[in-house]
């Protein structure tokens, strides 16, 4: 059990369950918190699809707008102006996505951005409006008034075109974080690829069929999808990366990419954060219709996609949900559903944990482990972050907070997740979560997550961070705002 008692948890279940019957009929509401000792204030509003932020001083932040490609400076709750304007392609999940300040930012002014470059030279939102390697990480230099391009760090696949299904622009990842080790970490989604880093040893068609989408050769760089990369500040691979020696033995472009990997087998993620106490990396992972995940990422982690989502023991449930013909079918006119790829349909999912584990592509030194927490049906987790202060009270210090990538659950949920004393696992108050799975009864539904609910009506929460003042800040893409959480006045 965590810091709350089971009796307190039962009270909380009743408190959050009562308004559910009215959620669909109610108009859009302002964010609210369940703890009456805390309050939400608007740090800035009037933004267009804000997606990520970085604090360059107290009351001074840079906020990214996904579709406009603009980086805006906000000082004392007011937008001061645009400090950078990039020509982005914002179709689906592309756009200006992530920002991270160099650990020595005050000295060198280096700012790193993850963005999808438009192929037209102007902002665009068409599915074909990117180059093949249109997702990129670049370094810029802050001069006190604007960001100036310094150098390109890395480029990733962006264009998705596969025979038999429509163009797509999702699963780009885009989150950037510097770790306590001074290295740059970036999440790259699978961009619809189906190859070795998606745990398909021979690609989806079986052996003997050449296809540069499944591991090379250049210029595809599919061997850099569905991964977390760990980089030196110039984009090179640190020699202590988990697959550095393996990549060196492989040689060539593929080997150089493998050297940069910290983890692989990811589907897609909108949230990544370092535990301020242990230094461990945590990330959330979005499922299709089932088994969103929260993972503590050890070096060399194979997260299991596409063979497994959620715990290995639940693979039969994973298959049953993803092959259910009554499930939502966003591409019904094109005749397929489940896993968003006809090239490896969900009917291929293994029937047993042993079968699923035996199919996985294990780079020497890789390891698979079950997620620390998962949800049976999709809840669409969004940005995550730790509260690294006592500003909200000691009970909240170093807890993990998770927004929603969709606003269907509680108008945009904000979850609070406590960790165990050794910081290696999730500490739950609800005995139903002791198996590590919230067995909700449908998509966007709260059952077994009542004890996690911290706030509602935050819309699409894409970034969560502790500010220089110790307060918790949440970026809401759908509400065009950044919210600040503090003790009630």
Predicted features, each with a name:
Residues 28-196, 200, 271-274, 279-290, ...:
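Acidic, Gly/Ser/Thr-rich repeat motifs that build Ca2+-stabilized beta-propeller blades
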Residues 11-21:
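Bacterial N-terminal signal peptides
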Residues 3, 28, 339-340:
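Intrinsically disordered, low-complexity regions enriched in polar/acidic and amide residues
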Residues 452-457:
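Short, Gly/Ser/Thr-enriched beta-strand-loop segments that form substrate-interacting elements
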Residues 2-13:
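Bacterial N-terminal signal peptides that target proteins for export
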Residues 33-34, 94-96, 104, 117-119, ...:
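Beta-propeller domain segments
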Residues 22-28:
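Sec/Tat signal peptide C-region and signal peptidase I cleavage site
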